[in-house]
Amino acid sequence: MACCAPRCCSVRTGPATTICSSDKFCRCGVCLPSTCPHNISLLQPTCCDNSPVPCVYPDTYVPTCFLLNSSHPTPGLSGINLTTFIQPGCENVCEPRC
């Protein structure tokens, strides 16, 4: 029996400003946080169909000002969410379930 359900994705809960653009791949559609003029780290949540890895690990740092400033285009802006969440059944994806 598999330890985790396939395609199950999880990130730590908490307030965040989610900004994903089409030129950056955000696994499971999750980007965490911040606000301009700071940089954000695109964090990839754990997917249960992979071998056990840390819940969240940094991927790429990108400036976000151009996405938040209306005087600049927003290439591929896909959405802005205010909170993160954990899918049902994935609360402890970093713990072995076998």
UniProtKB/Swiss-Prot annotation:
Wool. GO terms for cellular component: cytosol; keratin filament. Keywords: Acetylation, Keratin, Repeat. GO terms for molecular function: structural molecule activity. The keyword Repeat applies. It comes from the Eukaryota. Sequence repeats lie at residues 3-7, 8-12, 47-51, 55-59. The modification N-acetylalanine is found at A2. Signal peptide: none annotated. Residues 3-59 are annotated as: 4 X 5 AA repeats of C-C-X(3). Pfam families: Keratin_matx (PF04579). The keyword Acetylation applies. InterPro entries: Keratin_matx (IPR007659). Interacts with wool keratins. Belongs to the KRTAP type 3 family. In the wool cortex, wool keratin intermediate filaments are embedded in an interfilamentous matrix, consisting of hair keratin-associated proteins (KRTAP), which are essential for the formation of a rigid and resistant wool shaft through their extensive disulfide bond cross-linking with abundant cysteine residues of wool keratins. The matrix proteins include the high-sulfur and high-glycine-tyrosine keratins. This is Keratin-associated protein 3-1. It comes from Ovis aries.
